[in-house]
Structure formats: C-alpha cells, structure tokens
Regions:
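Rhodanese-like catalytic fold shared by cysteine-dependent sulfurtransferases
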Residues: 1-20, 24-59, 69-106
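Short, surface-exposed ligand- or partner-binding patches at beta-edge/loop junctions that are enriched
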Residues: 63
C-alpha cells in the first residue's frame, strides 16, 4: 500500500497540488480537528462511495487518527477501481506531532 508522510502532505497542500483528501474518522473525531478534507466515516464508505466516484483517477490521500482505518479504506477503494490511493502514515496524530502541535487529537 502506498503511503504519504505528513511532511509530504504538507508540501502538497503548500504547493496547491491536485489531490483529494479523504478523512475516514468518526464525526466526533472530525469535529475536534480536521485538515479540511472530505469526511466520510469508514463505516459509511461503501454506502456513500458514489459521492467520490469522480475521484477515481485523481490522487486520493486517506487519513484517520493513526493510519489503521485509512489503510482499510485504501484497500477498499483500490478494490473499487480507485487507481491512485495513499494512506497518510500516522494520521492526524502524526500531523499534530510533527506539523502542528496546536491541533487536538480525539
């Protein structure tokens, strides 16, 4: 599975690269802190996949709290024809630790 580090994600954001950020945490976690990505909880991804089908050929970076749920989402979307998915290594926990310590993690 392809992974992206939080430093690489930060560079993509700063460079205004063309990618799609998908946050698969629960709503309660997303409301505490987020990086402005599209929010679809992992448990709803199958039912809501039509919302993101237009991203199949775009780079999709998937995040969660630590990288476990996003890893499962990467495998799921890869099996549904998404050609360029990557897991954010360490999730928002790594972002808070390495990029922005002011971000709370739920």
């Amino acid at each position: 599975m392809k992974e992206v580090t939080v430093q690489e994600l930060k560079e993509k954001i700063e460079n205004d690269d063309d990618f799609f950020l998908l946050d698969v945490r629960e709503m309660s976690e997303y409301l505490v802190s987020n990086l402005d990505g599209e929010h679809i909880p992992l448990g709803e991804l199958d039912a809501r996949i039509k919302e993101i089908e237009d991203k199949k050929d775009q780079e999709v970076i998937i995040m969660c709290r630590s990288g476990n749920r996003s890893g499962r989402a990467c495998q799921f979307l890869g099996g549904k024809g998404f050609n360029n998915v990557a897991n954010l290594r360490g999730g928002i926990t790594a972002w808070a630790k390495e990029i922005d310590p002011s971000i709370p993690v739920a």
